[in-house]
Structure formats: C-alpha cells, structure tokens
Amino acid sequence: MTDHKIIMLLLLGIYCIQATQFTQVNIDNGPIKGTLQYVEGRAIRVFKGIPFAEPPVNNLRWKAPVPYTKKWHNPLNTTEYKPKCPQYVAPGTVPEPRGISEDCLYTNVWAPVPEYHGETFPVMVWIHGGAFISGSPEDFGVGNFSILAVTKRIIIVAASYRVNAFGFFSSELLGKSQLEARGVYGLLDQRLGLKWVKNNIAAFGGKSKDITIYGQSAGGISVCLQAVTPLNDLPGEKLFTRVIGSSGYCDILPMTNNSADAGLVQKLNCTTKECLYALPWQNITNAVGPGFLSFQPTVGINKFLPDQPISLLADRTNPRSKNFVPDIYMQGFTANEGTFVLYNYFPQTYDNPNTPGFPTQQMADALSIASGNYSAEFYYNDLAPLYSTEYNSNVTYPGQGFISRVDDIMACNTRRNMIYWQQSKKTKAHSWYFDSAPDTHIYPSWTKVFHESDVFYVARRCDGLWCTNLTCQQDNLGKTMNIYWNSAIRAASLTPKNKMDNLRDVPVWPQYGKNEVVMHFTAVGENKGPQTSVLFSSIISADGDYQYLQRCKILDRVRAEYYNIPALDPETYLNACSK
C-alpha cells in the first residue's frame, strides 16, 4: 500500500484489530467507533447505536425528547444495534436478539469512504414504517440501502422513534403540561433525530444542507407530516430540503386517540398520571396488544399538528404562501396496497375462493379497520357497496374487492396530495406507480405487488421473508429507480445530470401538473427500466361500472361531508396552478 493511501486511512480513523476493521469519527459528544464493511467491493463505514436523545423513561415518558448532551473522551462503541422501542411481541415469537427497551432513541449511519480528500456526500434519512404501532430502522434491514450508499455516494441515516402508546398516547390524564407534545412524541423523536443529523453529519463527510427524508407506510405519512408542520417555519428548524414518500400521505388524523387511550387506561387500571408513569413498559405493551392502527399521531392538541395535515398541506402549498416547502416532493404507491391488511387481519378471505367474503356491512367494518380514521358509518352507504361481494360477484377471491378499496384509499389520497404539492411554485412534485412483483413466500401470486415492495427495488436487495428474490430484469428496474432517487437526493431534480448516471438509459419523468402524469415503474423484458409516464387516470383499471377517478370523487365528497371540510376540486387546482 502506498504511503499516501496509508495516511488517508489514518486520517479517516480506519484501523484493524484481529481481522475486524474499525473506523472512528468525532461527533459533538465525542469520538465514536464503527466498523468498515464492504458492499459490491466498495468500503462503507457503519455506525450503529449512536445516542441522540436521553432515554425517555420515568418522568420523560410521554414527553418531548430531550437532546443527549453528555460528553465522553474515549471512543464510544457504536458497532451494534440498540434495542427496539417498546411494542407488542406475539406470544411464541422468537425474542429480539438485541431486546426491547424504553431506552431506545439511537441513530445509525452508513457512510461511504471518501475517495479523495474533501469528498462530501448528500444525506438520505430513512424513516421506517409499522402503522405507528411497531417497527425499527433495521426491521427492513436499512443496511440494505448500503448498495445505494456506495454506488451513488450517499450517506444513509436511520433513527428510532417511539411507537404505539409510547409514541402517541394522548389521554387527558397526562395533564396540560403535555400540550406541546401530547400525542406526537414519536414525531418529535423523528424531528430530534433530524436535528442530530443537521448538527453532526459533517463529521461523516455529509452535507448538512443537503438532506432528504424518505419513508414508507407510516414512514411515508411521517415525512409528509414533517413537511407540513408549522415547526418548519421557526428559526433553526429547516432540517431537510427534499422529501420522498412511499405508500403514505397527509390526510385526516384523530383529534385524540380517545378509544385507544380509554381502553388502555381501563386495562391498566390507572386513574392518575403518576400511576401511568410508574408502570413497567411491559404492562403497557401487553395491554395494548397487537391492535392495528390503535395509536396514531393526534391533531389540535399539540404544536406539531395544530390542524389537520391535509389543511396544513393546502395552506403551505398555496402559491402565495411564504412558508417552508421542500425543493422536491416525490410520492408514490404500489399496485396492491391492500394485500398487507388483508393478510394480517382477514386471513379467512385471503387465499380461499370458498369463503363468503365481504358483504356490504362487513366491507364497511373492514374498511374502517384498514383506514383507522373513518368509521363503518362513513363507508356504508356510498363506498362499501362498490367493493363488497354483492357488487364484485365476478371476482375469484372474495378479498379482491377489499384489496381494491385499500388500493383506492392509497391512490386517491396520493392524488389529492400531489394536486396540492404541484401548486407550490417552489416545489417540484413527482408521483409514481409501482407495478413489479418480486418473489415472496408470504403472498400468493394473485396479490401481485404488495405494500413495501417498491422499497426492495430501491435497495436492490430482498430481506428473505417478504421479498425472496429479484430477477435480473427487476434489478435493472431497481438500478433505474436508483438513478432517479440519486438525482432527487443530490440535485432536487429528476433530470439526472451527474457523471455517475446515464441520462440516455432512463425516460423523462415530468413534474405533476394539469395532465396528472406519473411514472409507471414496471420491469418489462431484459435491460428495460420503467415504462413511459402514464396518466394518473389510467393507472388502475375499471372495476365494474365505476371508473377509478369517479371512485376518488365519491371518496372525496363523502369525506368532506363526514368531516365538514371543503371538498377538493381537482380541476380548479390543476387548471389554475399547473406547471
């Protein structure tokens, strides 16, 4: 090895002990020690378990996170993941090797090794999903994004945040002192994690003014909420510049988690906040159980979400608004979003053509469970009949109508969000529709493209469970998606101009506007990337006599009446504000 390379490694803090290569950087608190790993023959620095907040235990439970300010002089070992935040674990489940603990607010960093002195990197912060009731940064294996990190020279960061009752409990028992943070502790954890990135990422070679947030499912909702919160307009609170949201959107959220809060308090037999604070976390997770969407961010009782997200989005993207908006907003969804919900909560109708399926009332009840915020009454008269067994008598599997409805929830809400984002003069808005099915041991073939499948293509790796294999054609599609993601992260543009990507290999991805054009990601044949852009209205085929956009209009009308909010007039927005 030449002398100058040895000096470069020493400057980067890279050294070997018994075949394990370590690397060291200095953050605000002191030096930290990570490991040097290799992905596709290229080195990447990996740091796991860096504290960014005080443990939210005892009197810090159900309060805004407190920055971790302790200093140290000897290198802190950051080579292993820390425990997951408290969440329900089903009986008989294999225990987490790293455990579960309330002391869970840590972040993880994957950083390329500089190839020349002074090389710096844009940053992508991953926010995990899990319906706000479960999950952690490494569940999907965010280290899988290491291919994106080394091939596109991007730093990947992923932090934990409180979920379930610990992240979104909003009972009045907590008292008025919690009004600033009540019901959004998990979102404030995300925000403190972003502040840590802003303040420390330069130590890893990152650009503190070049940060993109990317989330899926509850993470996709989270990145939208982070983009529309009024906290962005306070001094020192511009924490990111670009947003990528997969299978998540800004919509209506509960004013409080009344039923979940009351049920939890009753099960815990607590009538005072002192009782709630004194309980072991295991008592709380056991009382919550596996409830789907039982706890969510709340609105109107905290400073993070003083109003409904969809209203905050409409105000923020008004062309006359001077408030913060991201440089670019990318938002998309998969072809079979409802697969996950059907598989987990209605397995009797999942893969059995002989079950009775979903008559109208059962469909309304099921859709209420799936959406979290809408009651069965909301769905019964206008919406459930469009997807019930009586209406869809020609389907092979009774669950197909349910999956179609959840698909529409995702598609219609994505469309509504994009109509707002495209009117902002300062934001480049782009949307995608993902329609390529990886191999999976979990879902049968008729469910095709499941919730989260697009993330595996961006990572260009499977996790071995939900996704077991990507073909060469599918990996080529992943490479194409990487070109777009890289361009958005680097330049807030989906017209790639950097040297590492070849423009001739990818089709143009227009901004969302009057024609409502989206990118259709599908693997077709060898060496093919996405198809050319398509109109939003042509994405999903017609079900019976109802065209897709007609169903969106019905959903929007019923929604406006139910919540007493203005109905969206897409034509007005698209004609007046198109780009």
UniProtKB/Swiss-Prot annotation:
Enzyme class: hydrolase
Glycan-modified residues: 77, 144, 257, 269, 283, 373, 394, 469
Keywords: Glycoprotein, Hydrolase, Serine esterase, Signal
Source species, domain of life: Viruses
Enzyme Commission number, as recorded: 3.1.1.8
Catalytic activity from the UniProt record: an acylcholine + H2O = a carboxylate + choline + H(+)
GO molecular function ontology, one term from the record: cholinesterase activity
Primary role: May be involved in the disruption of the host membrane.
Protein name: Probable cholinesterase
Organism annotation: Acanthamoeba polyphaga mimivirus
